[in-house]
Amino acid sequence: MTQEQDGAIGDALTLLEAVVRARLAAGDAGASYVASLAAKGRGKIAQKLGEEATETVIAALTEDDAALTGEAADLVFHLTVLLAERGIGWDAVAAELARRHGISGHAEKAARAP
């Protein structure tokens, strides 16, 4: 990935997070899908995220690249809604990924508290 692509991904997530947070704050369920989803509660947001994860897996196994890309975008969108509803930003996720960088997946998993 080029530095430009890396920046574009970060910019896209930053913009998405800002829009989601603004719509959550506005709380206009009649005008905003984000607000209407949030009005149904965290459980509904989590359920929708699970549905999108399943659709992403199915697309990966049975559909074309465009379908997988679309489902991945839906998954990231709904994850952003859930994170924002919990008050967690993509900066926290990026910090956790940076912390794990260079650590073996097996070692990282073994170091987690039970």
Describe each PLM feature range.
Residues 1-71, 76-114:
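Flexible "arm" and connector segments at domain edges
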